[in-house]
Amino acid sequence: FDEFGRRIFTMMTNRGKLDVIQGITELTPQFTRVQGISHVWDMRLATTSLPKETLHKVLLQAAGGTPDVETRKRIARFLIQMGRYEDALRELETLLETPELSENQKNDLQQSVRALKQLSARRLVEELRMRQKAGQYQTVHTLLQKFPTEGIAGEILQEVKELLGEYEKKSVLAQDLLSKLDSLIQTIDETPTRQLCSEVFKEIAADLTPDTLPRLAAFAQLADDQSLPPEERVALAISGWCLGADSALRRLPVALSLYRVRGLILDYLNEEQVLKRQEILERLRSEEGATARYAAGILAHMRPPKPLPEELPQKSGCFEIAVTWDSKEPPAHYLVQLPPEYHPLRKYPTIVTLHGLQTTPEQQIDWWAGEFDNAGNRIGQAGRHGYIVIAPHWTQDQQVNYQYSAREHGVVLAAVRDAFQRFSIDTDRVFLTGHFSGGDAAWDMGLAHPSLWAGVIVISGRSDKYCTYYWENAAHVPFYIVQGELDGTLMSDNARDLDRYLNRGFNVTVAEFMGRGRDPFSDEILRLFEWMSYQQRNHAAADFTARSMRAFDNFFWYIELLDMPPAVITPPTSWPPRNPTPLVVRGRIPSQNTLLLQVGAARTVVGLGPEFVDFDKRLNVTINAQRVDTRDIQPDIEVLLEDVRRRGDRQHPFWAKIETATGRVSGRKP
């Protein structure tokens, strides 16, 4: 836009290039109305999406064009209403230098400047708290030390002082605990035991952060208790480090066994050969700490098992990784952008973003995390909020639309599961997103695999084909749909399914932009992050009903389908189906240790975890009104580790599994 709020919008039509002259006709702190001058077109933009320089020029011209006292005051008021306190403050400070101001005017302006400084300082404190919550401790500590003090209220400065005090307190506590632990280790008589304890100590000292410090809470409580032998206090530190403070133990042999078990688990998860995995498993079974309960705790508190590749040159925290999704197909690739101060022992929320057919994975990461600056760092919303961004390259050359295929699902799911093994991802906060055809894919994959996602964000995407039959699956995964009023037939195409969602009270948010067409909608990004902050995956749904029509849409929470009947399967190449009959899967957990399942496949695998099963009590599982024999079901470390190898979820692995026939028709060929 120029200073008069006009621009030329150029688009390609079937008649060639078309230039549309537009002008800003209404400017509010929330939205900007833009209308066509040469053509009929009425659209809305978020005012925050206008560059600061452009906004200032337009405001100045709208207020009369002359930067006099009243004009600058009007601009400052507008900026305050937008929440841009720093910009308003600069405007008023510039105004104070105007010689024609009277003393009363200067006093009034100085009072406004003081109030703006408080608002700006308060928002800076809120920003620092958000960055602290995102794990950016060094950045926050540095900014707290440089926090402006001139003209800032004592209440805010006291809050800053308390935040700095928390840092100093944690730093002193960490050094004190390390010193005490080191001293206790040196009192252990047995040399091999002392050496192994020293090895663990070096790891703790290297990885002790504000996120890992709570693991030593049990040790901190009893570190000075002289009634406990040094070995027991050391055991509290080592076991707490491996399992978390709530599971800390006093027996040093068991604590050291946990440390060895963790190393063997790491070897197991990285070993590709079955025979070698069995050898590792035998060594594991000889360890006292190799129970399913201990192994689950270790998995939840260990580093990701697979190593990181080399960073891309001059691109901080950015990686490109190849992943095998099918042994008969060439590897697929995906990009990953890590947030600032990433640490492998902290869990991070994650965005899985799918590009359109005319865009790239790099552009998707740029949209969420910002572009690289000259220093090779990104300054964008994903890093600010502490999110990992994953962008699979899911399309093929010359592809013209989303194909709803096994290949597309396989590439995306393989990238996600490989990322689980390499990066410290909070598997309860993984969000699937997509633009354009990537939005079509996100809508389909979100409904096909609702148990994987904390939420699904579709931007300029379409609900089509399988989505029409899977719509009830949306009851179990939140959706955020962003679309433009003038994006062809998109709104009418999506209307039926959106009506179904909204009329039944599903957790669905729909943002429709007036006068906007096929657009990436970058002006919605702050609302998207606010929405994501409230969402979390239901990893063990107590009551769900889901539908499937493809052989690869075969897992829902703790149920996996095997041998689906041919009558319900409709491959994408056979669309549309003649007689669509989706397979129905129902799971209900009315009480602990009771599972009531309805499964339309011939065989099923039921995963069992501690969230809904107490393995010390009798287990009741009913499938299709038939009781399943569960007398021999016990937690098994091999089942647990194989589940982690396959699904990558180290936060909620299954401790045991039941594989059984269901009495339904088999999909196998004779």
Sequence positions of predicted segments:
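A domain-start/cap signature at the N-terminus of enzymes
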Residues: Q175-Y348, E638-R650
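Gly/Ser-rich "nucleophile elbow"/oxyanion-hole loop immediately N-terminal to the catalytic nucleophile
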Residues: P340-R346, V400-F436, A448, L452
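C-terminal catalytic histidine-bearing segment of alpha/beta-hydrolase fold enzymes
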Residues: G488, S492-N593, G600-R603
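C-terminal beta-sandwich/jelly-roll accessory domains of carbohydrate-active enzymes
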Residues: R550-P670
